[in-house]
Amino acid sequence: MDNVMAQLESLEVRYEEIQEMMADPEVIADTKRYMEITKEEADMREVVQKFRKFKADKEEIAGNKEIIADGSDPELVEMAKMENSELEDEISQLEDEIKILMLPKDPNDDKDIIMEIRGAAGGDEASLFAGDLLRMYEKYAENQGWNVSIVDSEQTEVGGYKRVAIMITGNKVYSKLKYENGAHRVQRIPVTESAGRVHTSTATVAVMPEYEQVDIDLDPKEIRVDVYRSSGAGGQHINKTSSAVRMTHLPTGIVVAMQDQRSQQQNRAKAMEILKSRVYDYYESQNRDKYDAKRKNAVGTGDRSERIRTYNYPQNRVTDHRIGLTLNKLDRIMNGELDEVIDALTVYYQTKQLEELAENA
């Protein structure tokens, strides 16, 4: 904790400097600079507050130890001992919380994401489960106050999805959903199963951070643009004008569809932004083989034996195999109540990170 303490002292000094800067009229007048400063202050606030509480508790313990050493008032001594016991527990908890807050930040944690869900092993049932996962993530996003838009999809005849790509925007989206990468296995009786037998199917989920201000030039000749009528929410505007836009990047086959904006021009702009992000991700991997390997590494092959999580409908049970977490709350989880699962995954991986740092210290 000693090396962490030195970092915390420096952090507190910087925090006080930032608070002074936030009251400086020159900084306030510079909108960009002021936004940078307020973000830095917000990022530091929690750890500085906990560090100050940690120091205050330490001082209080020292004061109580003086009372105990004096020993002239037995009643005060007993109270000081009880208080120190509680403070020691609080300090221990604060140490753990501070260590986690001081862990190196994932540079992508604040970013929005593109999530791709594909029906894998299991035919029609896998495609239906892909649709169920889509709705689960949509409801979770709604609970978080995030926005979701479908950017590409291929539905099946039974109403499921062979594949669907969505963009989720909001506060710290990637930090919450980055652990959803992988094969998700479902065990249930398909609606098409007359004998009532439980089947096992899978769908894969890939989560990719959305790149901001991607510096890539796309040749307009290599982009096919299709316009069509919007469907879904939108009131009387629906199906009266061709405002929805689908863009296909011909060299890579990457497709983006956008219909959530109010006009074709807005949909074109948003679709191009997302297309650039996805093409950039593709070319960052050098070639399609590396791109496919990257995606496969994220989601696996989708084989039934591969899974990060199992959704067992007959037993109303969800098991995350990476951390051995089992919850008999499948109905609630499929309704978007993912917090308990995501929080447990976050704690698990933060703990692993702390252990690795301790080993290398």
UniProtKB/Swiss-Prot annotation:
PTM remark: Methylated by PrmC. Methylation increases the termination efficiency of RF1.
Compartments in which it is found: Cytoplasm
Pfam families: PCRF (PF03462), RF-1 (PF00472)
Keyword Protein biosynthesis: yes
GO molecular function annotations of the record: translation release factor activity, codon specific
Modified residues (N5-methylglutamine): 236
GO cellular component, one term: cytoplasm
Key words of the record: Cytoplasm, Methylation, Protein biosynthesis
Superkingdom classification of source: Bacteria
SMART domains reported for this sequence: PCRF
Xref: InterPro entries: PCRF, Pep_chain_release_fac_I, Pep_chain_release_fac_I_sf, Prokaryotic/Mito_RF, RF-1
Physiological role: Peptide chain release factor 1 directs the termination of translation in response to the peptide chain termination codons UAG and UAA.
Family: Belongs to the prokaryotic/mitochondrial release factor family.
PANTHER family: LD18447P
Name assigned to this protein: Peptide chain release factor 1
Species for this entry: Lactobacillus delbrueckii subsp. bulgaricus (strain ATCC BAA-365 / Lb-18)
